[in-house]
Amino acid sequence: MRRAALLIFCLLSAGAQAPEGGDTVRLTREPGLSAPARGVLSKLPPGVRAGVLVVDLRTRAVLETQAPDDAFIPASTIKLITASSVLDERGGSSGAWTAELTVPAAQVGRAQVSHLTLRGSGDPTLAVTGAYSLRALAQQAYAHGVRQVGQVRLDQTPLSGAWAQTPLGLPMTALRLAEWRVRPPATAAEAQARLGAALVQELRRAGISVASAQIGRAAPFRPYVPPARTDDQGRPLPPDPWIPLAQRPEQGVASVRSASPARVLAAMLRPSDNLRAEELLATLAHRPGGNGTLAGALARERAWLRRVGVDLRGVRLADGSGLSRENRLTARALVTVLRAQYDLPHPLPGKTGLPGALYRTRGNAFIEALPQAGTGENVPEHDGRGGTLARRLLGAGLDVRAKTGTLPGVSALAGYVTGRSGHPLAFAILMNGPEDAPILTLRALQDELVQELAARY
């Protein structure tokens, strides 16, 4: 009887010591590699190790594993985390970024204003011309009756200089222009000058005169706090609801809305654009909770990963592009992200349906932003539908949508393939080795493994 009581006590104690913070406890034995998969990976060059995880998204079965919880340098597959976090933060593909021009509340309706302030969402898609542009803002301000402006100001909420210390080596600013992709500003001061000059030019083009060529910085918004009031007996009274005009928030005279975030995510993921990836990560710093810092943006990514059930043991995030060799991901972390984007899809505009239907009909915004293998395009910028996978798996007849990753000694592939059963499979293949490891050989083995998976399952 005592032994039975002791056993019960030990079991209860063990339960009380379960891992904290949402750590995953796996009680089922997962399979290793099948013979065909082992045959492929047996051809890895000396010194190269691989982590593999493959899951059937319809049956939830784990199909193949090798070191799924080991941490690897992920290279550009980290962009899957960046894209997922931004898509979630924007509310899916129907969300948007916005920009507006504001004037002091006391000057609303006047033709002459002391200053005009540009405020934005921190995204990289605002352009000089087009629907979501400085030109459209200037034309709206003119239509609103603005004719003379004393000074143009920019709401350049400061972002941490830590981005300049990442391998990309460029500062991130709260207001950016799409045209900077070709020649991005080297400093925050250069960004301020170039953006301000472009806005002044568009205002003048629209018929609005600007007195000062000097670009100002918008004062940070501070909520009005009414003074305390008391009655003639010294007892506190409710605050006066009337806010003096000078203390009221500036009012908008023009606003524009971006296209679907799905478009810029595709423009980042398909060609594996490092600058766009860091710009998109910076939007998470710009939003409340990001604190204007790289660390704040990465913390928001980790928070999203926790929400979708990613086991964060071994995971380390250092940037948004994957250029940093300080990043670490596991195959399990990547497959959990892929599974979450399949199970909880963000439909493209005009698309509806359950996860399987959206996958089949090309309606899942995240999955459709990925490179598609074997499209055959041969474009130098990798900006076609196939992106960095356009020339891989040519003629294989497979439906593969996945993200590549490459650094010296690092090659990775993570995404989706439709198996012969018709089931969608989520897979992650991470390979790390010496910096002189033959990357083309690693890619060829990844492609061979994906073909084996599709044929077997």
Give the residues covered by each predicted segment.
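Short, well-structured active-site flanking segments
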Residues: 88-106, 212-217, 366
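Short, surface-exposed beta-strand/loop micro-motifs that present aromatic residues
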Residues: 102-107, 252, 411-420
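Small-residue-rich helix-loop
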Residues: 63-65, 286-457
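Active-site-adjacent helix/loop patches that line small-molecule binding or acyl-intermediate pockets
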Residues: 99-103, 111-205, 257-300
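Secretory targeting and sorting signals
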Residues: 1-20
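Beta-lactamase-like hydrolase cores
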Residues: 19-73, 97, 137-146, 294
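A small/polar active-site loop signature that marks catalytic segments
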Residues: 182-364
